[in-house]
Curated annotation (Swiss-Prot):
This is Urease accessory protein 2. Its main location: nucleus. Component of cohesin complexes. Signal peptide: none annotated. It is found in: Nucleus. GO terms for biological process: cell division; chromosome organization; chromosome segregation. Disruption phenotype: Does not affect urease function. GO terms for cellular component: chromosome; nucleus. It comes from Cryptococcus neoformans var. grubii serotype A (strain H99 / ATCC 208821 / CBS 10515 / FGSC 9487) (Filobasidiella neoformans var. grubii). Residues 523-633 form the SMC hinge domain. Residues 748-773 are annotated as: Disordered. The lineage of its organism: Eukaryota, Fungi, Dikarya, Basidiomycota, Agaricomycotina. Residues 756-773 have a biased composition (Basic and acidic residues). The keyword Cell division applies.
Length: 1208
């Protein structure tokens, strides 16, 4: 075994966690600067191995924690040593042992293999591995070698005794001495008690004779009293038997009456349920009857209204047909007028166009002639106008320039008018196309109106069918509402009754569980136990008694679900409840009796096998028996709970419970009723919701269909109203067409005028230009005069032609315009109005087919109403008959119920009388039992009776026995002073005397054994000291000779004899051991020689410092050989050695390291020469130490550097 690794954290200078690399099982050397933490490293090992730092105070623990210059504070520290246990020195069975010690300001803890351990366990484990408290020299810290060199002889003797283990012997001897003193004290007390007892025995011997006479009289008294008490006891027992027989008969009669009571209760319950059902049926039937009557009245009113509507339709159809004929005739006349006017208008249009052409040709012919004539007149008057030709030319040029500008303006105007004419013609073409489109739109409108009338008729038919479905659903909804209200009322009543059978906290808890489970959507909540099973009425009382309040326990899938529910319930403070998590319940095997008169209760329950654990928990150890005797038998034989069908229960622990059970307050019946009505309510409610949903869907369908009808009607009205708009649209294009034609005409006329003006200006400009090229004359030339005369005549004739053409054109255009106005504003409008009236009549009547379809629809609806009224008449008749039947049934059930209730009251009074008799029986029985108990107590108080007491006075009369008893009591009065316990006291004191004498003998034997033990301990202690001295002395000589081959050394025991101190070597001590006394030893001295094996040698006080250190080391090695340890720790043991001895010490350690581990620190190179592994200790500026493996050369360099620094 050896130290494998060491981990340090927070201990002294080792602030951070330092894990030392595995040590060599041989020789390990640790080097480092002074103050770097080498000694703290050894202190950490000693801290764990407990040879130091035991029972630390808070201040001492504080000093062990790291205190550096960093700002962080170390609050705890630990040192962990891992031992190689391959040789099995630690009895743990593992290859390694991990030992850790942890300290803090308020803790000091050990752990073994990562498990907490006490200090005593650690000490025992270390001692079992060879770590002796008597020999702590397997760890040699700094200063111990110096301490050994400075020891005097007496201190070395004390050290030898510690190594020999004399402290253990001293402790055992002190304990034996203490026990010996206690034994002497006990023996003295026993002697005093024996003296007192002997004196008391002599006094009791004198009282025994008088007591014997008293006992004879007392024996007779007890026999007489026994005879009297026994006779009374027999009388009381006989009376009890008679009462018990009467009680059993009464119980039998009571059971019969209770059975009748229970049967009658069931009958009453059946009658009440039948009565409730009949009343509910009556209420439902009456509600249906009222609904049928209301519907019948509504249908009769609707039938009357529908008949009136059909009559109105028929009348309106006849009037509409006559009016349509008149309008059609008027429309035909008006159409003829429009056609005639249109033909006349076409002729007038052609004539107007012709006259306009003639007017245009006349104007075009007049304009150039008149222009030339104007030029000649102007030229003629130019001579009077201008004095010179230059003035004339200037004027002509100005006129030519003005005419050119006028010509340009007229040209632009012509261009503008040409564009306007083209635009007007295009607009005229668009208006013509639009007029044709609107005419086509009118035809489409009529077709759409026809289709919409057909769609409206179909939708109205569908709506009528849906109204019939709604009526059926309304009737069903009314019926369901009444049924649902009744079911809910019964369910709430049953649940209130059930909640009244438990405390308020449980009731609130069950309600909260249902709400929380629904709110959190917990699927693992199965509900209260009573909701999860069914049982026949025969066993319900037995089941109720067995389950008790467990019926209200809530079954869940696992404890996690229960925890969620409990958390919310605690947070909301919503009652209390007990949960049964199925994953926590265990199945137990039960040995049921294999007999017909013992039925396992769980076999009579019907439940889902998923909940079997919960039911086994409550009912698994219970059986059902016929009577209490059978139940008690099986309870004793099989250790089960047993219950009778009536509810009397025998507990396997011995308790017997039973009595009357009110069947009217049965929890299971209430649960059954609650479940029944809850199921009925949920079914009715679900159906009610379905009916409501169906009604809502139908309402939506009807609303949608009516919306469609309204939309079609609105669209139809819009199209019908659009007829007038369409007329306006048709009229407006005609008017617009006329206006467009007029505008084209006006624009063309303006264009002609502009073109004529342009031509006139052009002709004038040409004349002026021509005149400008000729010389100015006072008069016209002859040719010009002839032309002037000709042009004058021509202009006059052309003007007359133009006037005539203008008059003809104005007349033709006026007639055309008047006819157009008449056609568009009068004839066409009247024709459209007639068409609209005819369309409205056709729309109101449904364009013939719609009107007849509407009438037929109304007639079908009337037939359906008649059929529905007949059906309702039948239903009303059936409902009235059903009401009469139910009233008769209710009356009959009420009579039967009243009769049974009267019988039940009589039976209840009879049961009450039996109960009162039972109470009287119980009172009388208790009195007799008390009297019997008194007799038994009296007999028991008589004590042990002689044999004659059971037969001596059995045949005598009671009065004689009483007379003789008085006489014997008078004789006993003279013995009033006698010590009645003399015999008992004598026997007790005799027994005590014998026991004390035995105890005294035992104490004497113990004292002898203790004296022998003390003598043996003294002898063993002397032997241990002598043996240890011999071994240490021997090993000292061997070690010293190894270290100093030329010298020798020995240990000398000093002994005090008659005031003188003698010295004995190992040989002389061996020879005189039998005569010696250990107590006479005064010390151990050391004598050595370093250069001779034969001279006397020197005492240690005479040696140099280096020699003293070597001698001390030799002594340490000798002690270690005497009691070897698995490893050794040496802290700078070679510090004071001379150079010539350091090599010898290093060689010895290397030799010893083959069988034990060595960990040493040094500043000398000799120790490094033969070491196996090297470690360096370093510290930083914050004085935090670390340790790590280094190479041998690095360790040598460090030692040499340290030596050089020391020399400086």
């Amino acid at each position: 075994m050896y130290i494998k690794t060491i981990t340090i954290q927070g201990f002294k200078s080792y602030r951070d966690q330092v894990a030392v690399d595995p040590f060599s099982p041989g020789h390990n050397v640790v080097v480092g600067r002074n103050g770097s933490g080498k000694s703290n490293f050894f202190s950490a090992i000693r801290f764990v191995l407990s040879d130091q730092y035991t029972k630390l105070s808070r201040e001492e623990r504080q000093r062990l924690l790291h205190e550096g210059t960093s700002t962080s504070t170390t609050l705890s520290a630990y040192v962990e040593i891992v031992f190689d246990n391959s040789d099995g020195r630690f009895p743990t069975g593992r290859q390694e042992l991990v030992l850790r010690r942890t300290i803090g300001l308020k803790k000091d803890e050990y752990s073994l293999d990562r498990k907490s351990a006490s200090k005593s366990e650690v000490d025992q484990l270390l001692e079992s591995a060879g770590f002796s408290k008597a020999n702590p020299y397997y760890i040699v810290p700094q200063g111990r070698i110096t301490h050994l060199t400075n020891m005097n002889d007496r201190e070395r003797l004390r050290l030898l005794k510690d190594v020999a283990g004399t402290e253990v012997y001293e402790q055992k001897r002190a304990e034996s001495t203490r026990i010996m003193e206690e034994t002497d004290g006990k023996r003295d007390k026993i002697l005093e008690l024996l003296t007192t007892i002997e004196d008391r025995l002599r006094e009791l011997e004198e009282e025994k004779e008088e007591l014997k006479e008293y006992q004879e009289k007392d024996r007779e008294r007890r026999c007489l009293e026994y005879a009297l008490h026994q006779r009374e006891l027999e009388d009381v027992t006989n009376a009890l038997d008679e009462i018990e027989a009467e009680r059993r008969q009464d119980i039998h009669d009571s059971n019969e009456k209770r059975k009748e009571f229970n049967d009658r209760e069931d009958e009453i319950q059946r009658y009440e349920e039948a009565l409730t059902a009949a009343k509910h049926s009556l209420s439902t039937t009456q509600a249906s009857l009222r609904q049928y009557e209301t519907e019948r009245a509504d249908l009769v009113r609707n039938k009357t209204e529908l008949e009136c509507v059909i009559a109105d339709f028929e009348t309106a159809g006849q009037v509409g047909e006559h009016r349509r004929a008149e309008l059609a005739e008027e429309l035909e006349v008006m159409q003829q007028k429009v056609d005639e006017a249109t033909a006349r208008l076409e002729d007038l249009v052609q004539e107007a166009e012709q006259r306009i052409g003639e007017e245009k040709a006349a104007r075009e012919a007049l304009e150039p002639t008149q222009s030339k004539l104007s030029v000649l007149f102007a030229k003629q008057g130019r001579a009077q106008q201008f004095a010179t030709q230059a003035a004339r030319d200037e004027y002509l040029r100005d006129e030519i320039k003005a005419l050119e500008e006028h010509e340009k303006n007229q040209g632009r105007r012509v261009e503008i008018l040409q564009n306007e004419v083209a635009g007007a013609k295009e607009q005229l073409a668009q208006l013509s196309a639009k007029s044709e489109q609107q005419a086509q739109g009118e035809n489409d409108r009529r077709e759409n109106l026809k289709k919409m009338n057909e769609e409206i008729a179909q939708l109205q038919t569908n709506i009528a069918g849906m109204h019939e479905q709604k009526k059926e659903l309304w009737r069903e909804e009314g019926k369901l509402t009444q049924i649902e209200v009744n079911a809910k009322s019964e369910m709430e009543a049953a649940e209130r009754s059930l909640m009244g059978m438990m405390n308020k906290d449980t009731s609130n808890g069950l309600r909260a569980v249902r709400q929380i489970a629904k709110r959190l959507n917990l699927d693992g909540v199965f509900g209260p136990l009573y909701d999860l099973f069914e049982v026949s009425d025969k066993y319900k009382t037995a089941v109720e008694v067995t389950a008790g309040n467990s019926l209200f326990h809530v079954v869940v899938d696992n404890d996690e679900t229960a925890s969620k529910l409990l958390d919310v319930m605690n947070r909301e403070k919503s009652g209390r409840v007990t949960f049964m998590p199925l994953n926590r319940l265990k199945s137990h095997s039960v040995n049921y009796p294999k007999a017909n008169d013992a039925i396992p209760m769980i076999q009579k329950l019907q439940f889902d096998r998923e909940y079997v654990m919960a039911f086994e928990q409550v009912f698994g150890r219970t059986i059902i028996c016929e009577d209490l005797q059978t139940a008690a038998h099986y309870t004793r034989s099989h250790g089960l709970n047993a219950v009778t069908i009536e509810g009397d229960r025998v507990d396997r622990k011995g308790a017997l419970t039973g009595g009357y059970h009110d069947v009217r307050r049965s929890r299971l019946d209430t649960v059954k009723a609650a479940k029944k009505w809850r199921t009925a309510y949920e079914t009715d409610h679900a159906r009610h919701i379905e009916v409501k949903a169906a009604l809502q869907n139908l309402e939506q369908e009807v609303t949608r269909a009516m919306g469609q009808v309204q939309a079609l009607e609105a669209k139809k009205r819009h199209i019908s109203d659009g007829g007038e708009g369409l007329f306006k649209l048709l009229t407006l294009p005609a008017r617009d067409l006329d206006q467009a034609r007029d505008r084209v005409t006006r624009l063309e006329s303006s264009l002609e005028e502009a073109e004529g003006a342009s031509r006139d200006a052009k002709a004038k400009r040409a004349s002026y230009e021509e005149e400008l090229r000729t010389p100015m004359r006072q008069n016209l030339t002859d040719e010009e005069l002839r032309e002037l005369e000709t042009l004058t005549q021509s202009v006059e004739s052309q003007k007359k032609l133009l006037f005539d053409a203008t008059q003809s054109r104005a007349k033709a255009v006026g007639e055309r315009n008047r006819l157009e106005i008449e056609l568009s504003e009068n004839l066409r409008r009247k024709r459209q109005e007639l068409r609209d009236k005819l369309d409205r009549l056709e729309g109101e009547a449904g364009n013939g087919e719609l009107q007849s379809g509407e009438v037929e629809l109304r007639r079908n609806e009337l037939r359906n109403l008649v059929r529905d009224i007949e059906q309702l008449e039948e239903k009303v008749s059936e409902s009235e008959g059903r009401v009469d039947e139910l009233n008769s049934e209710i009356s009959k059930i009420s009579e039967n119920l009243e009769r049974v209730q009267t019988q039940q009251m009589e039976n209840t009074r009879a049961i009450m009388r039996v109960q009162k008799n039972a109470e009287r029986y119980l009172t009388k029985r208790q009195t007799l039992i008390n009297r019997r108990e008194e007799c038994n107590n009296a007999i028991r108080d008589l004590g042990a009776l002689p044999e004659e007491a059971f037969s001596k006075y059995t045949d005598q009369r009671s009065d004689k026995i009483i007379k003789r008893l008085h006489k014997v009591n008078d004789g006993l009065k003279k013995f009033a002073h006698v010590n009645k316990k003399a015999f008992e006291q004598y026997n007790n004191f005799t027994k005590q005397r014998d026991e004390l004498m035995d105890r005294r003998d035992e104490l004497d034997q113990s004292a002898v054994k203790i004296e022998e033990l003390i003598e043996t301990l003294d002898q063993r202690k002397d032997e241990a000291i002598e043996r240890t001295f011999k071994q240490v002395s021997k090993y000292f000589e061997e070690v010293f000779e190894t270290l100093v081959p030329l010298g020798k050394g020995e240990l000398i025991m000093q002994k005090k004899t008659d005031g003188f101190i003698e010295e004995e070597s190992e040989e002389s001590l061996e020879q005189g051991r039998e005569k010696s006394d250990i107590d006479s030893y005064t010390g151990v001295s050391i004598r050595v020689s370093f250069n001779s094996k034969h001279d006397e040698g020197q005492r240690i006080q005479q040696l140099s410092g280096g020699q003293k250190s070597l001698v001390a080391l030799a002594l340490v090695f000798a002690i270690q050989k005497c009691d070897p340890a698995p490893f050794y720790l040496f802290d700078e043991i070679d510090a004071n050695l001379d150079a010539q001895y350091r090599t010898a010490v290093a060689t010895m350690i290397h030799t010893l390291s083959t069988s034990a581990q060595f960990i040493t620190t040094t500043f000398k190179s000799e120790m490094l020469a033969q070491a196996d592994k090297f470690y360096g200790v370093f510290f930083d500026k914050q004085k935090v130490s670390t340790i790590k493996v280094i190479e041998k050369e690095e360790a040598s360099d460090f030692v040499e550097t340290a030596a050089q620094v020391g020399q400086l």
